[in-house]
């Protein structure tokens, strides 16, 4: 049986009070509509069609290559939105699942189960339902004695008996495709909002003698629709719990999973430990047996095995195996830390490669530089790379030693086995085995203390 998915993503979402269109708000690193498309892909459909309206070009940019698109010119209800896909689907055999782009928590498993139930039951329409702990505000599912759906009763229209039902409409449906578009052409807009409702299709099909059923999914939380910032935070919390639990099932330890924020595309190896208040975002990959301490923030970075990150920030950076950093250090874009290197506290590295077993201990800035292996960079060293107009590069060879407080003014090359004395300002190349000293000579002034202002009118021994 052919399968199609229609995702409704034309609404602006005024309750979000945002310039960003509702379905483009992110949950754990992906837009809401991307989460829905990802779940849809898990059903191996023949077509995914996203109905766009407000912010159409922005939504198309996000979903480029993942979906076909239909355009809803005016937002005249869910029935009108599905009808916008008429030209792409009308005459096709198969089943069509309809979902909304603001429900990011639905899983591929749930969508697959809905397709399966729909096809096995021989329904023309199947409603995805759930048991709600508090069904207030939801449409209630009213079934007949055989379990078929008679109608969906909205909160404002229900009798006390109907409102006592806790099975609710999640807003996701599966239809016989041809019957869907035949029924949509019969939907009217004789209601207070003047809109065309997709739910009216159920009554049209039932009256035509078609079977309308339901599939009750076990996890009500999947059905959460996001209409405001409160619901966005709730969806993020639920998604985050899922992500962290999946990592834990795969061998990752979380000291406090409730406070660790991990984006959905992050990969983490087994035996890695994540402390609380850690943020890991984007396409970050972390190897096995790593330790990430509290208050670390890692974005779009690649981390090898046996790496320790202590309360530090990494952005578009790379740390190879057996390296460590922190506390309170910062790897900026294109920072590469090679195997065995040590980055200490209060170090900033930008667009620089730190070679194997090199140590950059503390209070240092390394920018636009290539450092070889087995180098020691002393405390307070500055790689001065910018003249106010251009950035310049520095090279430091293997087995070199840079003393504390040195300033390396690029462009300059320091050869293998070179030595830079502490507090030197280096402006010229340093050759192999040479030591560079560039600082003023010390001069001692005998008995000068008594000439200083602080010594006047005071008794000093």
Curated annotation (Swiss-Prot):
Acetyl-CoA binds at residues 385-386, 422, 439. Mg(2+) binds at residues 102, 227. One of its GO terms (biological process) is regulation of cell shape. Pathway: Nucleotide-sugar biosynthesis; UDP-N-acetyl-alpha-D-glucosamine biosynthesis; N-acetyl-alpha-D-glucosamine 1-phosphate from alpha-D-glucosamine 6-phosphate (route II): step 2/2; Nucleotide-sugar biosynthesis; UDP-N-acetyl-alpha-D-glucosamine biosynthesis; UDP-N-acetyl-alpha-D-glucosamine from N-acetyl-alpha-D-glucosamine 1-phosphate: step 1/1; Bacterial outer membrane biogenesis; LPS lipid A biosynthesis. It holds the Pfam family NTP_transferase. Keywords: Acyltransferase, Cell shape, Cell wall biogenesis/degradation, Cytoplasm, Magnesium, Metal-binding, Multifunctional enzyme, Nucleotidyltransferase, Peptidoglycan synthesis, Repeat, Transferase. Its cofactor is Mg(2+). GO terms for cellular component: cytoplasm; membrane. InterPro entries: Bifunctional_GlmU, GlmU-like, GlmU_C_LbH, Hexapep, Hexapep_transf_CS, NTP_transferase_dom, Nucleotide-diphossugar_trans, Trimer_LpxA-like_sf. The keyword Repeat applies. GO terms for molecular function: glucosamine-1-phosphate N-acetyltransferase activity; magnesium ion binding; UDP-N-acetylglucosamine diphosphorylase activity. UDP-N-acetyl-alpha-D-glucosamine binds at residues 8-11, 22, 72, 77-78, 139, 154, 169, 227, 332, 350, 365, 376. It is found in: Cytoplasm. The keyword Lipid metabolism does not apply. It catalyses: alpha-D-glucosamine 1-phosphate + acetyl-CoA = N-acetyl-alpha-D-glucosamine 1-phosphate + CoA + H(+); N-acetyl-alpha-D-glucosamine 1-phosphate + UTP + H(+) = UDP-N-acetyl-alpha-D-glucosamine + diphosphate. It is an enzyme of class 2 (transferase). Residues 1-229 are annotated as: Pyrophosphorylase. Its EC number is 2.7.7.23, 2.3.1.157. Binds 1 Mg(2+) ion per subunit. Residues 251-461 are annotated as: N-acetyltransferase. The active site is at 362 (proton acceptor). In the N-terminal section; belongs to the N-acetylglucosamine-1-phosphate uridyltransferase family. This is Bifunctional protein GlmU. It comes from Lactobacillus johnsonii (strain CNCM I-12250 / La1 / NCC 533). The gene is glmU.
